[in-house]
Amino acid sequence: MTTHALAHDSQPPGLPATRKQQDYTEDRRRYWDEFSRESTGWQPLRTFYQKRLAEIYRFLIPPGMRVLELGCSRGDLLAAVKPAYGVGIDLSPAMIAAAKSLYPELHFIEGDAHSIDLGAQFDYIICSDLVNDVWDVETLLKNLARHCSPSTRVLLNTYSRVWELPRRLAEKLGLVKKTLTQNWLMTSDVENLLYLANFELIRVGREILWPVPTPLVGTFFNKFVVKLWPFDLLALTSVLVARPLP
């Protein structure tokens, strides 16, 4: 587990990035640029995972909303929730280029989620698999406030620490793409960081127990078994919903 996102002093949005943060961000920009160009044997696993996430987010976000996604990748999740006005932010130029090509009806901007300021508010803000990957989770969450109204809902999903070792094993076996250093955060960690950023956690759902694309079995485990104790403790990801504190 890396602790950089929790250990160093959080810097207010808008301040210049430190050299370490710049290097960290550049490493990720290169990684995701490369990721956007690859199509290898592990793609079916990722496609299955992303499809299930899209189902979950469609359940939580009604169509026709104003939606902002930070770390939007190719824009697939943003498009899946069918926003009336959708904006995606990503630090990877290659990802943004792909998103613009795939979904010309949406708006995509290359930028850093720690400091982006769009001068607009949204009904929903999505941070999917983002807090695991960013330099400073607290700064990221504090920066969301400028895009929130009192009724805005922030939706995050984050990998469970239970899956850290299985993930490393899958990487060694070539089943998934090797990741850069991650923030393996517990739900309680994210809740505390949300509170520090002036957000209140209002919903937690544990999702995806069977991340392998197998007919019927995947549906059974991921829609039913994962909701039952103690199997929910083994879920791959947690989906959290938060709102601004008054």
Regions found by a protein language model. Give the residues of each.
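Class I SAM-dependent methyltransferase SAM/SAH-binding core
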Residues: 73-114
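A conserved beta-strand element that flanks and buttresses the S-adenosyl-L-methionine
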Residues: 126
